[in-house]
Amino acid sequence: MEAEAADAPPGGVESALSCFSFNQDCTSLATGTKAGYKLFSLSSVEQLDQVHGSNEIPDVYIVERLFSSSLVVVVSHTKPRQMNVYHFKKGTEICNYSYSSNILSIRLNRQRLLVCLEESIYIHNIKDMKLLKTLLDIPANPTGLCALSINHSNSYLAYPGSLTSGEIVLYDGNSLKTVCTIAAHEGTLAAITFNASGSKLASASEKGTVIRVFSVPDGQKLYEFRRGMKRYVTISSLVFSMDSQFLCASSNTETVHIFKLEQVTNSRPEEPSTWSGYMGKMFMAATNYLPTQVSDMMHQDRAFATARLNFSGQRNICTLSTIQKLPRLLVASSSGHLYMYNLDPQDGGECVLIKTHSLLGSGTTEENKENDLRPSLPQSYAATVARPSASSASTVPGYSEDGGALRGEVIPEHEFATGPVCLDDENEFPPIILCRGNQKGKTKQS
């Protein structure tokens, strides 16, 4: 989940964040400012370690890290049509690609990299950056709203199917085919997100009062939650916990809501044979005769837990993560702060603020800490083939303007392994087939 801050408050270049995003498994936070970008590790409550920082690219408004790998994707306001992919631990640029209009958002998993423009979406194979598909003539999407499942075995993509209604197009990023269309809301979409396995999709409209969860790939509604009654609420972020038990939503208000996804059952338990039980059963039966909007409201679940922010109106994003073996709610704001809360997974209620970190200072820089936590492994054959030397870089062939990509270097295979034991497994991650010469890549369009 990524957010681009609105107007920075007065106070200098680093007075606020231009953008901020949690990585796919909520173990890292990336921030962008007018001065550059930074990456932070989220392994501790008491200490926020800066993994990397760069001032080489100014005025950053998109920064995305691929899990806990060395790959980071950056877009700057100085070149808003150009995407840059870096290997930050080696201090090298892997590739850069230019597109026909400004880049609004980027999503990535270990299989696909998506570049979203206002009226098109480009789907790349992340391992060699070959353009696989260009979705043209999609409804205008001025905010670049889209979601990509982090489960690379399906790589589902979701994006708005209409500018005026809450229709969602579900697309399979592996088979490159449209799966279904979901009529999620009456109003325009404000947020969409997948759970970790790609089996559920949550959405909210611009009104921001109702959040719905659908099954994937059939698009059936599973849950409906009511965030509140206040109108004109802007949902800033919507995210599942990694185990899909919870769904949290932050907005431009001072409250973050956490909903619990209870087990869906086909039959309701019998009410107790008491007067109150009988009246409850009659009340639920009566909702069948009420107008649809009223009946739906009666069946909507309320928040399981909430967190109070000491601000409102600021751009922010939230996530649910397990840090030091306990569930935590994390909220990053455009003012340059990260708030950490404890979440009670059994009883819910009010989340307790336990730590506030500044994201604007120099912080504790530990460039090699993540490497120290992993066993030392030899470089894979795929990496050796892909990068014979720093001065002799293989390139992806150029594409037309519709294809968007102008040039780039093949990405080392070992960056996409799911864990240390697989980094040099050529059966699971075979060597990259290098693209040489001026041969054009075939571009599929729809």
UniProtKB/Swiss-Prot annotation:
Outcome after substituting residue 205 to A: Loss of binding to phosphoinositides and abolishes puncta formation
Biological processes annotated in GO: autophagosome assembly; autophagy; autophagy of mitochondrion; cellular response to starvation; glycophagy; nucleophagy; pexophagy; positive regulation of autophagosome assembly
Keywords: Autophagy, Cytoplasm, Cytoplasmic vesicle, Cytoskeleton, Endosome, Golgi apparatus, Lipid-binding, Membrane, Repeat, WD repeat
Cell location: Golgi apparatus, trans-Golgi network; Endosome; Cytoplasmic vesicle, Clathrin-coated vesicle; Preautophagosomal structure membrane
Gene3D superfamilies: YVTN repeat-like/Quinoprotein amine dehydrogenase
Resulting phenotype, residue 251 to A: Loss of binding to phosphoinositides and abolishes puncta formation
Protein name in UniProt: WD repeat domain phosphoinositide-interacting protein 1
Biological source species: Homo sapiens
